Structures are given as structure tokens and as C-alpha cells.
């Protein structure tokens, strides 16, 4: 390090020691501070570190960021530019003191790996230029296969080059096409009523008068509404670069008063981590901004975590995927190596490189056609073949009826989950999608969703996210105008998505209670359940609204398929829907419906 660099670093950083940690005070400065922070972390003498920022607005560029190849679940793998890299610390505290952290370009702002205690508090994250393209829809001609936009320019970055849009043009990166796109209500910024997910790849773009662009796409089936704001986040291959916060193989984690206005993937992503709290925090668009998207994927995401997870008093809005997704991972049996060893495969390309198990983990064996968890066995050896295949050796002999195409699920890494007192609305996809066999409590939340508000869905198909639930309590929530996209959903939807080798009738999820909720809805469907054993729907108040025209007016309020032991009691409905309960022959055998008001049993 040069003498000048040393002097600058000393001016920006001051060091002190408390009883437990090395405290690094970071004074405010203008310009790029990324390398200063990197040096502070890398030169820390203790394994207990606290970064304390003087309140201010800080800029983080990628020129001198750490470059590291990362496998990131549900994102694109590759070299990532990391600003805050914490690896192997006993404890880490980051205190922003109300600061704003502004990033530019493809960046993984925070990565925590192998840390025993983490606390991040009092900080807001944003990007100076969002990785998005949006414009007001001013005209549509379905017959001629075009729509016209007046693109936003202030605060956005894009160019029209050779009759195609290039964006964002930051650090020589552009998406290959407009990609994943949705129309939004210009006033509320919510996804537009009746909207469908669409992937936009224009054949060509014409420049018209007054800053208007005409987009031709000959295979487009669903056109945006004139007056809406059409927003695009880029092609699927590149539009999940990294989460704002990546935490893996860590424990005892607290985020408090942390707000994310933009990120190039998820907001908070946790892999194989234990005991997590997200408190008084948020993912939402900055006040006064004309952006209609906050972050490009889930607000929060938990993959193969354990211990207790709590999300409380948070606000999640504007993201382009779920409010939260909690799941394990199914791996598929590729080959039986010997009596104790099996080769397994990660099946989704955004799972490649994920650590499914380590020595000492207990694993369930699930053998088609039944989706039921069968015997357990303990892993004694893990041999990674590559990012796709791994050999697992077990303590006991593998069952002789295990075969290629069956799946394994990690028993050790499953969390209990509580979501309390949050507001989740005005975003793509579902408020909550969750799959864990341990206790789930969802209470006192304000929820409004494009798709189903709450979805319980394990799947041995596509994402291969495990697994079936065994104890769920959904109570005292306020649901407002949920499932307003074009596709058919419900307030609560339970729908396993299993591969062709698995039974489509065997019971999958169990012991779900949906009680004391207030539901204000423009449409009919409240609960849509498939293959549930033990579903209680009681003491809910349902009120019809006239916010939108019903999308599926012929749907039943409660729709049951291949279910067992369902009780629908003491619910009250006020509105004009007359179709109350629909149940197939299997569900009717053990169905109890009584003491409801306002709809037919």
C-alpha cells in the first residue's frame, strides 16, 4: 500500500476495541468507498468485527470490488463483484446509523459465509441506475402486432441501437432482450389487474415522434393496457445476478431496520443457515421514485435453513417475485453406486452447485409413485462430482427398492417459520410460498397478491423445492383483493407439483388451520386445496368488494380435490357469490361443513 493510500485509509477509518469485538468507525466521504471497506474487512485483526458508519450517503462502485465465483441458489452462477465480503467471522455487526448505500452496476453487495453471529441494522440499499426498462403504454394495435411506449429517461439508462433496446448499459453490460415484463397500474404501481407474465423479445423497434417507441412482436398474445406502465427486467439468463444480502452456512442472524429499494436478484437470501430474524425492515420502492419495480426477485428466500425463522413488522412491495419463499431441496437419484452410496442430481439449473447435504445430516428417501417420506439415513461421506452430481454415502444400507428417478430430501435442514405483522402487496407472484415440515405460523399480516396470497407447494418437478407441510396456522390476517392476475389462483392455494412418476392422488400436505382471517375479495375463490389431510377453515369473515370485475365468477369459494378430514365451519360471507363448497368424491367422504353464513354448504 502506498503512503498516500495509508493516509487516506487512516482518515476514513478509526479503530477501537470493545470487550468482544474490533470496532471500525467509517467516516463519511464522497466518491467510491468500496475499496476502503474491502481493506477494512480484510485487514481486521479480530474474528469479531463491527463496522460503524457515520450517517451519510455512500457510493459503492465495482472497479476494485472482490471478484469471486459463486454458486447462488435461484440465481445465475458465476463471478460476482462483492463489496462487503465476510468469511469465517465469529461475529459481524454492520451499523449504518441511518445511512444510504448506493451501488452501481452488477454487484453482490453483501456476502456472509461461515459466520457464527450476524447483525445488520439501520441501513438502506439502492442503485443509482436500476436494471430495468419501463415506459407508459400510449397505443396498442393487436392486428398489426405492435404497442407503443413513451419510455422513462430520468434515472434510467437505455439506448435504441439498430432497432432494438439496449439496457442498462452499465459497465458494458446489457440484457439480450426486454425479457420478463409486466404492465403496472400507473397510480398504485401494483401489477395491473388481469395481467399475465410475458417475455418480451421484440422483432424490431421504431422511433416515433415525441419520444415514443413502437415495439413489434409478432408472437405476442397478451398486450398491455393503454395507460399502464410496462416494466421489463431483462432476459431470464441474466436477470438474477445476485441478492442484496447472501448469507450461507451461518447462524444467529438478525436484520433490523434494513431497507432495500433495488437489487439485482433477491433481497435477503439464506442458504443452509440457522436462526434468522428480519425485523422492522423492508423491500419497497423509494418514496417519490417513478420506478414500478423494487427488486427483481423474492424479497426474502430461505433454502435448506434450520432453527427458527422470524419475519416481523416488515414491508415488502414492488418486487418481481414472492414476498417469501421457504423450502428445502429435492435431489433426484441418478445412480445406485453400491449398498451404501447413491449418486444424486440437482435438477434445476439455478440449483447447480448447491450444497444439498454434509456429513452427519439425516436424509429422507422418497420413492415413486408415493410422495411420502420413507426411511431415514445418515450421511457419512460427501463426494462432489461436479456442480450437477454428488455421491452420498450413508451409515446404513440403502433400501433395495430405491431406484433412479426417486428423490431425497434433507431432514436435518428444515426450519420452523413465523411471519407476523407484515405488509406484503403490489408485487409479482405470491405473498408467501412455503414448504417445511416444521411449524409454520402466519399471523396478523396485511396481504394483497397478484397470484395466490399464500401457496403451499412442494415439487418434485421444475424447481424441485421440498417439501410437504405438517403443521400450519394461518390466523388473524387481512387479505385484500388477492389473486388479481390473469391466471387462476386463490387466497390460499395448496397444490403439490409432482413429476409424472409420482401419484396425483396420494395425500401430501397435512394439518393446516385457516382461521379468524378477514378476507375482502372481488373474486370467488378463497381456498383451493389438493391432496391435503387435515384442513380446518373456521371463523373467517369474507366480504365481497367491487374493486375489480370477477375474473373467475364461476369458481367455488372452497374447492377440494383428493382431500381428507376437511372441516369448514363458522365462516361468514357477505356478497353475491352463491357457489360455496365444491368437493370431489374422495374429499366428500370425510368432509364436515356446518354453521356457515352467507353461502351454501
Regions found by a protein language model. Name each.
Residues 38-43, 60-93, 102-121, 129-146, ...:
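Extracellular beta-strand-rich solenoid/capping regions of secreted or surface-exposed proteins
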Residues 186-240, 373-417, 425-426:
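Small/polar beta-strand repeat architecture
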Residues 103, 127-129, 138, 152-206, ...:
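Ser/Thr/Gly-rich low-complexity blocks that favor extended beta-strand/coil architectures
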Residues 24-51:
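Acidic Gly/Asp/Thr-rich repetitive segments characteristic of extracellular carbohydrate-active
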Residues 49, 56, 82, 90-92, ...:
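The right-handed parallel beta-helix/beta-solenoid scaffold, focusing on the short coil/turn
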Residues 52, 59, 85, 93-95, ...:
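Extracellular beta-strand solenoid repeats
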Residues 62, 103-109, 129-133, 242-244, ...:
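Short glycine/acidic-rich loop motifs that flank beta-strands on beta-rich extracellular proteins
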Amino acid at each position: 500500500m502506498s503512503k498516500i493510500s495509508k493516509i487516506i485509509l487512516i482518515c476514513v477509518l478509526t479503530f477501537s476495541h470493545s470487550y468482544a469485538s474490533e470496532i471500525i468507525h467509517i467516516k463519511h466521504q464522497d466518491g467510491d468507498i468500496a475499496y476502503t471497506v474491502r481493506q477494512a474487512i480484510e485487514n481486521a485483526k479480530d474474528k469479531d468485527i463491527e463496522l460503524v458508519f457515520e450517517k451519510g450517503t455512500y457510493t459503492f462502485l465495482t472497479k476494485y470490488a472482490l471478484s469471486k465465483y459463486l454458486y447462488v441458489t435461484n440465481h445465475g452462477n458465476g463471478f460476482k463483484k462483492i463489496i462487503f465480503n465476510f468469511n469465517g467471522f465469529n461475529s459481524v455487526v454492520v451499523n449504518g446509523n441511518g445511512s444510504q448505500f448506493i451501488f452501481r452496476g452488477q454487484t453482490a453487495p453483501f456476502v456472509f459465509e461461515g459466520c457464527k453471529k450476524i447483525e445488520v441494522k439501520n441501513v438502506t440499499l439502492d442503485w443509482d441506475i436500476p436494471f430495468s426498462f419501463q415506459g407508459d403504454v400510449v397505443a396498442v394495435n393487436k392486428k398489426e402486432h405492435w404497442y407503443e411506449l413513451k419510455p422513462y429517461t430520468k434515472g434510467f439508462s437505455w439506448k435504441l441501437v439498430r432497432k432494438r433496446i439496449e439496457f442498462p448499459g452499465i459497465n458494458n453490460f446489457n440484457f439480450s432482450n426486454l425479457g420478463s415484463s409486466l404492465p403496472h397500474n400507473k397510480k398504485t404501481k401494483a401489477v395491473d389487474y388481469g395481467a399475465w407474465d410475458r417475455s418480451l423479445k421484440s422483432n424490431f423497434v421504431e422511433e416515433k415522434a415525441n419520444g415514443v417507441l413502437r415495439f413489434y412482436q409478432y408472437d405476442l398474445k397478451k398486450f398491455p393496457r393503454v395507460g399502464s406502465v410496462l416494466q421489463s427486467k431483462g432476459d431470464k439468463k441474466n436477470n438474477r445476478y445476485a441478492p442484496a444480502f447472501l448469507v450461507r452456512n451461518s447462524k444467529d442472524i438478525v436484520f433490523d431496520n434494513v431497507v432495500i429499494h433495488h437489487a439485482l436478484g433477491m433481497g435477503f437470501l439464506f442458504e443452509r443457515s440457522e436462526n434468522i430474524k428480519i425485523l422492522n425492515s423492508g423491500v419497497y420502492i423509494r418514496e417519490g421514485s417513478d420506478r414500478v419495480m423494487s427488486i427483481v426477485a423474492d424479497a426474502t428466500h430461505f433454502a435448506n435453513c434450520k432453527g427458527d425463522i422470524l419475519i416481523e413488522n416488515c414491508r415488502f412491495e414492488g418486487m418481481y417475485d414472492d414476498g417469501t419463499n421457504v423450502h428445502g431441496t429435492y435431489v433426484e437419484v441418478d445412480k445406485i453406486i453400491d449398498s451404501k452410496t447413491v449418486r444424486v442430481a440437482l435438477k434445476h439449473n439455478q440449483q447447480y452447485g448447491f450444497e444439498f447435504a454434509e456429513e452427519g445430516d439425516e436424509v429422507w428417501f422418497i420413492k415413486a409413485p408415493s410422495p411420502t417420506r420413507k426411511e431415514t439415513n445418515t450421511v457419512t461421506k460427501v463426494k462432489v462430482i461436479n456442480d450437477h452430481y454428488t455421491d452420498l454415502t450413508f451409515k446404513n444400507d440403502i433400501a433395495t427398492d430405491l431406484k433412479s428417478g426417486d428423490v431425497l430430501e434433507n431432514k436435518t435442514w428444515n426450519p420452523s417459520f413465523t411471519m407476523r405483522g407484515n405488509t406484503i402487496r403490489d408485487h409479482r407472484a405470491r405473498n408467501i410460498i412455503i414448504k417445511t415440515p416444521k411449524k409454520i405460523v402466519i399471523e396478523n399480516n396485511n396481504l394483497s397478491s397478484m397470484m395466490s396470497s399464500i401457496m403451499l407447494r412442494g415439487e418434485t418437478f421444475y424447481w424441485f423445492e421440498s417439501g410437504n407441510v405438517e403443521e400450519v396456522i394461518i390466523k388473524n390476517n387481512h387479505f385484500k383483493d388477492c389473486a388479481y392476475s390473469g391466471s387462476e389462483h386463490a387466497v390460499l392455494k395448496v397444490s403439490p407439483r409432482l413429476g409424472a412418476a409420482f401419484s396425483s392422488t396420494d395425500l401430501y400436505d397435512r394439518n393446516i388451520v385457516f382461521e379468524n382471517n378477514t378476507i375482502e375479495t372481488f373474486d370467488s375463490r378463497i381456498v383451493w386445496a389438493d391432496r391435503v389431510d387435515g384442513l380446518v377453515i373456521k371463523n373467517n369473515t369474507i366480504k365481497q368488494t367491487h374493486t375489480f370485475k370477477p375474473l373467475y365468477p364461476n369458481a367455488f369459494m372452497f374447492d377440494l380435490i383428493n382431500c381428507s378430514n376437511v372441516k369448514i365451519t363458522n365462516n361468514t360471507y357477505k356478497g353475491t357469490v352463491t357457489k360455496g363448497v365444491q368437493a370431489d368424491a374422495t374429499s366428500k367422504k370425510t368432509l364436515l361443513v356446518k354453521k356457515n353464513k352467507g353461502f351454501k354448504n
